[in-house]
């Protein structure tokens, strides 16, 4: 059966016949959400094919871990994480943290170094084994994101550039609410696909199943029952802004990322609480 919008159940218009996953891209004008594929079964088959191939070999964390996260990729992620943490820390009231999609393990280690009691999930068993050797107290479990199940509750749930990869993001966001403490926060960052260059990158260069705009993401989380604490669009700082920041320390509160508008920012961030 042809897919409809996961938010309003409305009909979709074809946006593009091509994508990184060789799936067509469809668009809901009502929700401003871009969706990969024409049927759920088609999407499941493409994702299964992707992860059975060389995907995990190409995303191995060994280089990053062996460099103690001094490699170029990790340093770029460090700059983004610093900004994310500055954006969220005023809302954090406890120290238990669950990271959804640990990747190479940079963020979960940096949170542990900040004194958090960290847990994480990651589908690549090789990465999990290496990351667990780096963490002093924290633990990463090998499981798919959508297959995750736990009775534990956390002060912070952290999900950076993972939601766009899920087959059923609404179902996942409903389920993970049970793992968030009453006064806890849920941080999500995704590509800002209202910014045209990022939309094209999300479609053409990455195996993303959903391509979110601010309207689509906020509608999704509110309909599930989350309360939006903060939502913003961010871009990397320019060199001149970096110089200004060195002189005037309080110029950019989330440096080295700068808050901007939906048509010029790379990343879309949202902080949620259970309503």
Predicted regions and their residues:
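A short His-aromatic
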Residues: 161-165
């Amino acid at each position: 059966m042809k897919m409809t919008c996961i938010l309003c159940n409305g009909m979709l218009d074809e946006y593009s016949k091509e994508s990184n996953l060789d799936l067509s891209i469809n668009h809901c004008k009502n929700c401003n959400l871009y969706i990969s594929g024409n049927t759920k079964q088609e999407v499941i088959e493409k994702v299964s094919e992707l992860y059975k191939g060389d995907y995990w070999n190409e995303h191995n964390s060994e280089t990053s871990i062996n460099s103690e996260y001094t490699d170029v990729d990790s340093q770029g992620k460090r700059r983004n994480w610093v900004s994310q943490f500055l954006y969220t820390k005023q809302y954090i009231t406890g120290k238990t943290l669950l990271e959804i999609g640990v990747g190479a393990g940079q963020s979960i280690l940096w949170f542990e170094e900040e004194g958090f009691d960290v847990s994480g999930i990651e589908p690549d068993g090789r990465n999990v084994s290496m990351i667990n050797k780096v963490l002093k107290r924290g633990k990463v479990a090998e499981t798919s994101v959508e297959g995750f199940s736990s009775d534990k509750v956390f002060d912070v749930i952290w999900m950076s550039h993972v939601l766009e990869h899920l087959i059923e993001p609404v179902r996942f966001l409903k389920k993970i609410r049970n793992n968030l403490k009453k006064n806890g926060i849920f941080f999500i960052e995704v590509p800002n696909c209202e910014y045209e260059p990022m939309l094209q990158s999300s479609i053409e260069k990455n195996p993303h199943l959903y391509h979110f705009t601010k309207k689509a993401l906020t509608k999704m989380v509110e309909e599930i029952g989350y309360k939006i604490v903060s939502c913003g669009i961010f871009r990397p700082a320019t060199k001149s802004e970096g110089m200004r920041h060195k002189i005037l320390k309080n110029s950019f509160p989330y440096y080295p990322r700068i808050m901007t508008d939906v048509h010029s920012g790379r990343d879309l961030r949202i902080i949620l609480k259970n309503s």
